[in-house]
Amino acid sequence: MSIFIGGAWPYANGSLHLGHIASLLPGDILARYYRAKGENVLYVSGSDCNGTPIAIRAKQEGVTAKEIANKYHEEFERCFRNLGFTYDCYTRTDSEHHHETVQNVFLRLLEEGHIYKKTVEQAYCETCTQFLPDRYVEGVCPHCHEEARGDQCDACSAILDPLDLLEKKCKLCGSTPSIQETEHFYFALHTFQEQIKRAVEIAKQTGTWRDNAIQLTERYVKEGLLDRAVSRDLPIGVPIPVEGYEDKKIYVWIEAVTGYYSASKHWAEETGKDDREFWDSEAKTYYVHGKDNIPFHSVIWPAVLLGIGEGAIPRHIVSNEYLTVEKRKLSTSKNWAVWVPDILERYDPDSIRYFLTVNAPENRDTDFSWREFIYSHNSELLGAYGNFVNRTLKFIEKYYGGIMPKGSIDVELKDKIERLYKHVGEAIEQTKFKVALESIFDAVRFANKYFDERQPWKEREDDPVSCEETIYNCVYLIANFANLLEPFLPFSSERIRNTLSIVNRNWEPQHTLPTRIDSVKPLFERIDVKQIERELEKLYGAVK
């Protein structure tokens, strides 16, 4: 089976925060799981280096947009690598390859009659002497009356046009823009109304989209899909490949999401492999992002794919809700966030991955609190999982001189592990990552109980053969926990695999156990709870 996984492209205008990772982490869990199953996986993403936020940041700092994009693209790559993300291709939207692919898609849509020209009114800043693209205009949402950008309201998820906004202001200088006529290209989205309606109906029946994606897309379909501008007067981006319009840029509506397609083509060229199977209607596709990106993946991208004749429209939409910090909404402008480069300096990446999975905003907003983060590490990763691994392997080191005791796998334990693989695998495929991880940790707690009830420290003297059986089965459980947890906690899984000399990495019960165990080290270290206050002081002290 061909599995395509696309992770949303973060804007390269500032550091990643935990909100980004909370929405993107499911992609890596899926990729690791499906590779272990032996499926053909293509997992792609990249940095959005063309977005308006980058141009705005560059202007504010007095540097070029390229300098801003380079800085944060490199930082993103480093952060994703240190968090264990296993992208097959992580690229950027200002690459020559991406520009060429997007222009080809634009021309194909134009040839097929899905794009047309239209004279429209647009916000124009007399002070800055330029037309203002959507994100250069800010104001009040006409629907919910909250603060909004010219393209979308984060408060009510309404898709907007800058002219819809009340109390419009230029983001660059703060002045009120005038309205002037200009010519732009439009995507005939209304012609895909029935196909998008059918797609959301199927998703509702099969449960392959998150509820927020279903509800929001049903709302758009009910209101009637509106044609959307796909060109803008932007300083950076992909030029319109039509004579006389080269100064205009292809707008984010189709440019950014086409990044999945360009990354796929880039991967094919780099590896010499064929990527066509990932765009066939039989491919299983997952798109992983936050709820603010739903319309791009449930409406725009399917319409683009249908317009160019590709069959692999989004089958699974994994659109997480928002992550708050200490019960408050994340705010990058106010510096109310936990920044990824910062947290990675002091904490185990598996601790971050664990917390953001068991507390994932899968169906509702969830909160990151330093207290919960540190206590979850100490009680679950260290106290439950690390404790079971350490007490078992230390027992072998102390009483058997590192030589693996002989034994046979208990039938009940074998059956339990086989059922666990099936249950966890199904949960991952259904994008129920929290359920999957909690199920494994239920088994970890069972394993600790098994160790306590068998009392190998007493069996060693009273019934040495039974003691060997107990420890043998504990190692069997550890080997399989490492395998089951690899999609979630890859770093600690790798440490266990190295300790146990595990070679087989397939998604199946591990029956081959080591003959010797050397250099047993703690799987996790305890975090001093005093660190909670230090982190809170740092967080509150940095607020602007």
UniProtKB/Swiss-Prot annotation:
InterPro entries: aa-tRNA-synth_I_CS, Anticodon_Met, M/V/L/I-tRNA-synth_anticd-bd, Met-tRNA_ligase_1, Met-tRNA_synth, Methionyl/Leucyl_tRNA_Synth, MetRS_core, MetRS_Zn. It is found in: Cytoplasm. Monomer. GO terms for biological process: methionyl-tRNA aminoacylation. Binds 1 zinc ion per subunit. ATP binds at residue 332. It catalyses: tRNA(Met) + L-methionine + ATP = L-methionyl-tRNA(Met) + AMP + diphosphate. One of its GO terms (molecular function) is metal ion binding. This is Methionine--tRNA ligase 1. Zn(2+) binds at residues 141, 144, 153, 156. The lineage of its organism: Bacteria, Bacillati, Bacillota, Bacilli, Bacillales. Its cofactor is Zn(2+). Its EC number is 6.1.1.10. The keyword Nucleotide-binding applies. Is required not only for elongation of protein synthesis but also for the initiation of all mRNA translation through initiator tRNA(fMet) aminoacylation. It is an enzyme of class 6 (ligase). It comes from Bacillus thuringiensis (strain Al Hakam). A motif ('HIGH' region) lies at residues 10-20.
